[in-house]
Every structure is written in structure tokens, then in C-alpha cells.
Amino acid sequence: MMDVSSSVTTACSYLYFPIFSPYIIYIQVIVAKLNSHLVQQKMDTRFTRGKSNILERPLTRPKTEVSVSAFALLFSEMVQYCQSRVYSVSELQTRLADMGQSVGASMLDVLVLREKNGKRETKVLNMLLFIKVNVWKSLFGKEADKLEQANDDDKTYYIIEKEPLINAYISVPKENSSLNCAAFTAGVVEAILTHSGFPAKVTAHWHKGTTLMIKFNESVIARDKALDGR
């Protein structure tokens, strides 16, 4: 289909008759207005066609799920991407933890709003239970297997997963047997704790399956004891 406006514009550009020049100028003005109208119409169509109402959706909408195969593919690609840019297992785990921290920081506010109606926890144990139950269900569709406290250190807690989904589809070569890709999950947990006002260092270890070791700052435990003493 011929574009009428472009045809008229082309004709006016290449033909010149002195007698009719006022009319040609008039025609050019009309064509310019027509072009402007067509451009505006196209822009209106572009921005209204299939208009997304994402800003109007409530944050409390039902949670969506991703297939395990899609997760396995994406996570394995993440691991390979990181592996190609490091020279040791510790560097690889650090990169995975950094990626996990980005995820944890992004999901915290929405998760607190959906699961806790915006209420933030102030006690260490309640915060850890929130992670064990709510965060784990949001990430993996189930609660974490266990939450334990170290016998000899009141700053240290453990979240234990016998068969973590994060490692289910990762094949670790013998020369890198110390690699635990749950460092990504450790990063998620560390970011959630830190951004919630519970600064801690979280690391992943092979023990009883996979264990996330959470070591809180002294200030967190001191504050918790002060709250207990009120």
C-alpha cells in the first residue's frame, strides 16, 4: 500500500513551478500537518496497544512459580558465567554470593509486605524463622529442613538443607570438590538479614547436606539481649 504523505512530499520536493509556488507551499504545509498527525497516531498506537497495567497490580498478588527445568538452566548458566571469570573456588563462591545478595535485597520489601503486612521483625529468632519459613517457601516452595544454634557461640546459627534445590542439578568436578553453589543462597540470606537490620556474615558449607552458617555481629546479639531485658 502506497504511503500518500511520502508520495506528496516527494513530488513537492522535486517539482517547482513559479506560478503555482504559493499553492505548492500551501500543499507542503498540509502535508507537514498530515505527517505530524500520522506520526502522532503511530505513537499513540505504540504506547496504547497491549498497554500493561503492571503499575496497577497489587503487590499482594498471588506468587508465581518457575519450572524446575527453567531454574536449573538459568542457574547453571550463572555458574558457568562466573566460573569463566575466576581462578579459584573461593572466588567463584564469592561471585555467586554477590549475585545472591542482589536477589535478596530486591525481594525483601515485597516479601515483607506480602507475608508480614509490612511488619518488620526486631528479634533474631523471629527473623531467622521468617527466613526458614517464608523466604524458603518463596524461593524453593518449601521450608528449610532445620534451624539450629551453635552450642558454644550465641552469635552463630545454622540453616540446614539435606538436599538443596540449588545444588540438585550442579555437577562438581573432583578437583573442585569444595565448591558449594549454595553460596548463592547464602548471599540471599545475608542481604535479607543485613537490610533488615541484622548484619551478619553467611557462608555455605558441606555438612549434613548443605549448611548455611550465619554469624551475627556483636551489636545484633547485644540489642537482642537488651530487648529481652525490657
Would you name each region that the model predicts?
Residues T185-P199:
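Mixed-charge, glycine-accented linear interaction segment located at domain edges/termini
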Residues A150-D152, K174, C181-A182, T194-S196, ...:
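Intrinsically disordered, low-complexity regulatory regions enriched in Ser/Pro/Gly/Thr
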Residues M2-C12, V31-L179, I221-R230:
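N-terminal accessory segment detector
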Residues Y14-Y26:
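Aromatic (phenylalanine/tyrosine) cluster motif
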Residues V202-N217:
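Beta-rich nucleic-acid/ligand-interaction surfaces
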Residues D154-T156, P199, G209-T211:
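Broad gene-expression machinery/nucleic-acid interaction feature
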Residues L111, E143, S196-A200, A204:
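Long, hydrophobic, amphipathic alpha-helical segments used as structural scaffolds
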